[in-house]
């Protein structure tokens, strides 16, 4: 079991957002969405999230995340 600790308020968006410059974020997709991570350092990447799913995403602080539908995200820390 993984314990997740929210570090900030959850925010919802579709356009590019750094999510408080966080390194680890919890992402919730209320509808099917293609999620894109944009980076100045690494190649841009993307993945698909199905409706009602949650993923943990690790990124660099300046990297942005965006979705084709609204994403609800919050910075987190975790303990395995």
Per-region residue spans from a language model:
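Beta-sandwich interaction modules
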Residues: 16-18, 50-63, 79
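Surface-exposed ligand/attachment interfaces on beta-rich extracellular proteins
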Residues: 5-21, 41-43
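Exposed low-complexity, polar/acidic, P/S/T/G-rich flexible segments that act as propeptides
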Residues: 71-80
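Short, surface-exposed beta-strand/strand-loop-strand elements in extracellular ectodomains
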Residues: 28-46
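N-terminal compositionally biased, intrinsically disordered segments and leader/signal-like regions
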Residues: 15, 19, 37, 49, ...
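Short, solvent-exposed linear motifs at loop/edge-of-secondary-structure regions
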Residues: 19-29
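Noncatalytic modules at the cell exterior or secretory-pathway interfaces
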Residues: 23-25, 57-71
């Amino acid at each position: 079991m993984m314990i997740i600790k929210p570090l900030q308020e959850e925010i919802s968006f579709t356009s590019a957002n750094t999510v408080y410059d966080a390194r680890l974020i919890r992402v919730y997709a209320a509808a099917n969405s293609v999620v894109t991570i944009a980076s100045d350092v690494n190649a841009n990447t993307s993945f698909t999230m199905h409706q009602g799913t949650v993923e943990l995403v690790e990124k660099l602080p300046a990297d942005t995340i965006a979705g084709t539908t609204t994403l609800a995200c919050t910075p987190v820390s975790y303990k395995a």
